[in-house]
């Protein structure tokens, strides 16, 4: 339990009830939701915030001990005390706080009798001057010991001081003390005194009457005696001068202002001197001021009267009781009024003097006697009776001649025997110095019964330690006069009778008188003896009292000296105390500041601790992440090592490829030289062509005559259509996952007879084509280029291919007949499995060549079946539609609709497909002299090393040659390869399907000079013509047999598709013949002098395929690694054929490098046709002369 939470039992019960009220949610603690309870105290939010922070030691809630501390702090704030925990420790009991709408702690406010008697005893103890009051200064000291705050004690004083006279009587003191005790018990002070408290505090003395109140400015007689004695010792001439009074008064330690006021009050008649009673007034005022009592502004009348020696205090306090004659005879000692001063310095008790008289019963002369009682007082003093009333003077009888004797003994009568003995008893003298008189009783003869009764006033005077003499005149004068005795008259009558008797002469009764005197003398002696003994006793007691007085004075001097020393020590201690208080105050301020700093630092520490915990958690997370990263780093390093090894392997491959590149460049340079030589030869051939044109015109006439003769001879035979070699089929199609079947149709041109009478120089008949637009810029008609082919046979030892000219286009076709299913595989650079179609632009003419590069070649006997199936290609996008063979009309014109016109097989552009990419086939008539001697050009192409296959280009994925020679079906720039399901060495036939890998195969055959019907010099002799006629007849029979198999052959071999993933095909529209419903599509890739992927000029677009859709295998948008399949045809273990390196992109344009080697005048290599079906592909290359500026509808 917290030390600050300790409360009295009454408060504990009340605070527990308050805790139950404040705990709204009944969870046993005061949380933030319950903190609104403290707003009932009406304190500010700042004070309540400080109270909460001091009470809250559990960080967010208060338990019951913390709640008690908070209530104490609220009460301190309401009282105006500092709101600190130290304030709780300094105040023993803090009253409950005042809360709105909450009842306070209940109290009945009734004082029990036992408790009230304790308060009365305290009042009597602290009422030092015995005036029945406790002044404010005394109350401050008394009540300050309770430890309650000054503000609370001030409230208690205001409640208790009912009379508002700035002092408390006994009843008010009882109420004030009870209120203090109630606060210490834990009760709250009331705003006004309850009636029950006033009723229960009423004080009744033990005598049954309320306690008397001594007048405020009454000087007690003991004090007056002391002041008078002090005056007698220091007075000069019965007065006190101002200088003497100043020296004496300054010893009191009062201020000059108070001493001046005391002088003015004492010197009431402004005489500037002090007599005895003024001196007593001044000393009494000094005594009261030192006790803390305020000085009056004017001299009270009671103070002036009580300073005189003749003042009777009994007349102020209570009148003396008067006894009746009967009661006075029975009562020997009346009640005495005692006055207590309460001052420890004085031990004086003043008793009222009470006189008792007893009359003498006999009429005879009886002397009056005074009885003396001497009860011992508490102080050891003596009780002195009042003075005995003086008896009348008696004269001794005249018969006695002795002179009158006077008894001066103290306490006895004086008998005067002089005067002739007339007076028997002399009148005792009155002495002021006599303070005690002992009465005696004259013993009469036994015959006379005498009654002795006391006849004196009893007064008891106690001599204290402060008196200077045992006997004092003032004591006698200040005593009230004795009450007259009832026996005074008889005594006087007896005395008068005696006196009268003494005046008479001596009678016989003188004897009796003498005897009477003797008896009186005896009585005197007895009385004297008794008085002597008693006087001795009194003297012993007096000596004792004087000795005691001297000792007390000596002790008083010592005490006074010690008192002065103590005062000096007190002053020094007060100075030290004030300095200590100042130090304590500064320390308290420092402590409060330190506590504020501690609170702020504590909050900062908590924030830093929370931040440290967060940073620690973050550090752990980062450390764990770092460990994971280290693990990943190790793995990556291992992968890096592997990649480095692979890179080293690849670098070795690159070095070998670079070496191959060097070889290729050397070959290209060689080819370039050959091309330049070919250009010169072509120029010579062009000149020769012009010469032959003249001869051709003459021969045409002879040819027409021969044709007429042949027609007559062949009436019984069916005409055989011989396909002219000048028909160039640029049929190219790409099927995506479909198979298109097109049948190539052999279009007969003319039947050349082997008659020796055939005039070579006669012009054969020309069949004109139907009217078609001759320009692609005509608006009315669709442009369909039409040309007529004239067949001219020449003999050439190196090449037996037929060279045809049509519209200035020089074309040669190398037909190949497939006789075996699969030819022998070899690593030769030139294969002979396919037809070669090449085109060159020479003097405005276009020379095309269909080359198929393949290292697997076969040598076979050439058959001039110009309608061979190898040269029929499926149209692009045929969608697996099969078209029957179509025979051209008499005009022999074939049109191709690229714009969706016509029927037949549908190409992807909506037009019908036909095998002839140039439209209608030409007739056998020759329009111009374009068929000059071009055998040398054909021979050049056959011998051109550019088209020879090098092992380095067979299957290598060289970045500089993969576009021409790599085996792929996807984009080589990271595209995914497909499996090669067929052997690259397969030759296109009815039984085998070419490989789907994009392989450029050079399909060529060895020439057979014996099968060439025409000499190379274009001049025929009779022997050669006869052999030619025989061969033509055999060829016609073979052609008839082959015409029956075109459909089957086309179905097996012409389903070619291509999916090289370049998505960069350019289409070239060709004319369409609506009558024949045929369509021919030609498109190709132009390798211009631009970087791959640059689609700014429309040459390439790697982002979309031919259908306009995004390529699924775009190497720049997919991270799919290439899946390779090893080449099973790599029989020779060519390291560049079967290897799968990852060089999927060309670092520079092929054309650029090619042109750098060849030169700007060399023709650019362009892929004219790419056809791939499933696993088959084929390609045709077109060489365009850049120097030819003649516009063509097929120019890209």
Curated annotation (Swiss-Prot):
InterPro entries: EF-hand-dom_pair, EF_Hand_1_Ca_BS, EF_hand_dom, EH_dom. One of its GO terms (molecular function) is calcium ion binding. It comes from the Eukaryota. This is Epidermal growth factor receptor substrate 15 homolog. Residues 512-718 form a coiled coil. May be involved in clathrin-mediated endocytosis. It is found in: Cell membrane. The gene is eps15.
């Amino acid at each position: 339990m917290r030390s600050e939470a300790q409360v009295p039992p009454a408060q504990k019960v009340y605070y527990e009830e308050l805790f139950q009220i404040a705990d709204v949610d009944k969870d046993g603690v005061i949380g933030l939701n319950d903190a609104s309870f403290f707003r009932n105290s009406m304190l500010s939010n700042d004070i309540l915030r400080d109270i909460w922070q001091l009470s809250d030691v559990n960080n967010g809630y208060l338990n019951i001990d913390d709640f008690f501390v908070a209530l104490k702090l609220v009460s301190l704030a309401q009282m105006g005390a500092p709101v600190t925990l130290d304030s709780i420790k300094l105040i023993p009991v803090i009253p409950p706080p005042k809360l709105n709408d909450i009842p306070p702690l209940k109290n009945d406010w009734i004082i029990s009798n036992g408790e009230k008697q304790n308060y009365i005893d305290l009042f009597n103890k602290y009422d030092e001057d015995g005036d029945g009051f406790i002044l404010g200064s005394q109350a401050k000291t008394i009540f300050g010991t309770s430890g309650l705050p000054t503000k609370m004690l001030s409230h208690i004083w205001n409640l208790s001081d009912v009379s508002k006279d700035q002092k408390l009587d006994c009843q008010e003191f009882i109420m004030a003390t009870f209120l203090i005790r109630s606060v210490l018990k834990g009760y709250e002070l009331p705003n006004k005194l309850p009636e029950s408290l006033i009723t229960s505090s009423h004080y009744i003395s033990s005598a049954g009457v309320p306690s008397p109140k001594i007048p405020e400015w009454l000087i007690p007689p003991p004090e007056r005696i002391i002041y008078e004695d002090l005056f007698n010792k220091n007075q000069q001439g019965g007065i006190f001068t101002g200088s003497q009074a100043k020296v004496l008064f300054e010893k009191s330690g009062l201020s000059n202002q108070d001493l001046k006021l005391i002088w003015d009050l004492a010197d009431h008649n402004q005489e500037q001197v002090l007599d005895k009673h003024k001196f007593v007034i001044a000393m009494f005022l000094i005594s009261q001021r030192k006790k803390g009592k305020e000085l009056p502004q004017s001299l009270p009348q009671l103070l002036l009267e009580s300073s005189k020696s003749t003042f009777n205090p009994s007349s102020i306090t209570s009148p003396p009781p008067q006894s009746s004659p009967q009661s006075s005879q029975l009562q020997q000692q009346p009640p005495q009024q005692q006055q207590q001063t309460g001052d420890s310095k004085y031990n004086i008790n003043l008793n009222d003097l009470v006189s008792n008289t007893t009359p003498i019963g006999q009429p005879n002369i009886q002397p009056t006697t005074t009885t003396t009682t001497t009860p011992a007082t508490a102080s050891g003093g003596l009780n002195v009776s009042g003075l005995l009333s003086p008896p009348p003077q008696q004269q001794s009888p005249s018969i006695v001649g002795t002179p009158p004797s006077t008894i001066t003994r103290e306490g006895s009568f004086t008998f005067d025997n002089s005067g002739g003995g007339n007076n028997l008893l002399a009148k005792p003298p009155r002495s002021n110095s006599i303070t005690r008189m002992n009465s005696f009783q004259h013993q009469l003869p036994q015959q006379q019964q005498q009654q002795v009764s006391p006849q004196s006033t009893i007064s008891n005077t106690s001599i204290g330690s402060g008196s200077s003499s045992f006997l004092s005149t003032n004591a006698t004068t200040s005593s009230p006069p004795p009450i007259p005795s009832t026996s005074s008259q008889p005594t006087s009558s007896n005395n008068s009778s005696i006196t009268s008797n003494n005046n008479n002469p001596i009678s016989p009764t003188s004897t009796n008188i003498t005897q009477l005197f003797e008896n009186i003398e005896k009585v005197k002696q007895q009385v004297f003896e008794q008085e002597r003994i008693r006087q001795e006793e009194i003297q012993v007691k007096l000596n004792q009292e004087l000795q005691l007085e001297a000792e007390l004075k000596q002790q008083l001097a010592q005490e006074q000296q010690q008192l002065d020393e103590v005062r000096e020590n007190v002053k020094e201690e007060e100075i030290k105390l004030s300095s200590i208080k100042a130090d304590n105050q500064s320390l308290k301020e420092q402590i409060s500041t330190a506590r504020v700093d501690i609170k702020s630092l504590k909050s900062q520490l908590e924030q830093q601790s929370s931040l440290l915990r967060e940073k620690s958690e973050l550090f752990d997370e980062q450390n764990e992440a770092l460990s994971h990263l280290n693990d990943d780093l190790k793995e990556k390093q291992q992968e890096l090592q592997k990649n480095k090894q692979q890179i080293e392997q690849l670098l070795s491959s690159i070095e070998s490829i670079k070496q191959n590149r060097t070889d290729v460049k050397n070959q290209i340079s060689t080819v370039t030289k050959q091309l330049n030589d070919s250009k010169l030869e072509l120029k010579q051939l062009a000149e020769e062509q012009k010469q032959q044109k003249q001869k051709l015109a003459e021969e045409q006439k002879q040819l027409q005559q021969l044709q007429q003769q042949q027609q007559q001879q062949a009436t019984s035979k069916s005409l055989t259509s011989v396909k002219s070699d000048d028909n160039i089929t640029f049929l190219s199609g790409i099927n995506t996952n479909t198979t298109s079947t097109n049948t190539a149709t052999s279009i007969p041109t003319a039947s050349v007879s082997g008659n020796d009478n055939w005039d070579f120089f006669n012009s054969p008949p020309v069949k004109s084509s139907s009217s078609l637009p001759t320009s692609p810029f005509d608006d009315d008609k669709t442009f369909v280029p039409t040309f007529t082919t004239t067949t001219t046979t020449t003999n050439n030892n190196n090449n037996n291919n037929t060279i045809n000219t049509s519209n200035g286009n020089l074309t040669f076709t190398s037909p190949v007949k497939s006789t075996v299913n699969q030819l022998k595989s070899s690593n030769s650079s030139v294969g002979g499995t396919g037809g070669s179609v090449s085109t060159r632009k020479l003097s405005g003419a276009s020379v095309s060549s269909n080359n198929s590069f393949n290292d697997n070649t076969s040598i076979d006997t050439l058959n001039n079946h110009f309608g061979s199936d190898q040269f029929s290609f499926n149209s692009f996008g045929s969608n697996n539609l099969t078209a029957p063979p179509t025979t051209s009309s008499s005009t022999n014109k074939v049109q191709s609709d690229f714009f969706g016109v016509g029927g037949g097989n549908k190409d992807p552009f909506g037009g019908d497909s036909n095998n002839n990419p140039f439209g209608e086939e030409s007739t056998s008539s020759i329009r111009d002299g374009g068929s000059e001697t071009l055998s040398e050009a054909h021979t050049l192409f056959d011998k051109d090393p550019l088209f020879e296959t090098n092992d380095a280009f067979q299957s290598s994925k060289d970045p500089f040659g993969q576009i021409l020679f790599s085996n792929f079906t996807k984009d080589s720039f990271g595209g995914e390869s497909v499996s090669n399901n067929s052997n690259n060495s397969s030759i296109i036939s009815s039984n085998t399907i070419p490989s789907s890998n994009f392989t450029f195969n050079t399909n060529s055959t060895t020439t057979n000079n014996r099968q060439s019907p025409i000499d190379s010099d274009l001049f025929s002799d009779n022997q050669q013509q006869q052999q030619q006629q025989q061969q033509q007849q055999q060829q016609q029979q073979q052609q008839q047999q082959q015409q029956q198999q075109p459909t089957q052959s086309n179905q097996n071999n012409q389903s070619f598709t291509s999916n090289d993933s370049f998505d960069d095909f350019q289409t070239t529209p060709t004319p369409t013949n609506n009558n024949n419903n045929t369509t021919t599509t030609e498109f190709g890739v132009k390798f211009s002098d631009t970087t791959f992927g640059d689609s700014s000029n429309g040459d390439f677009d790697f982002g979309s395929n031919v259908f306009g859709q995004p390529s699924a295998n775009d190497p720049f948008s997919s991270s799919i690694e290439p899946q390779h399949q090893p080449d099973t045809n790599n029989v020779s273990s060519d390291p560049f054929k079967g290897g799968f390196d990852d060089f999927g992109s060309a670092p520079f344009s092929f054309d650029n490098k090619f042109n750098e080697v060849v030169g700007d005048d060399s023709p650019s290599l362009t892929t004219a046709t790419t056809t791939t079906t499933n696993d088959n592909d084929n390609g045709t290359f077109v060489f365009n002369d850049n120097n030819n500026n003649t516009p063509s509808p097929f120019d890209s």
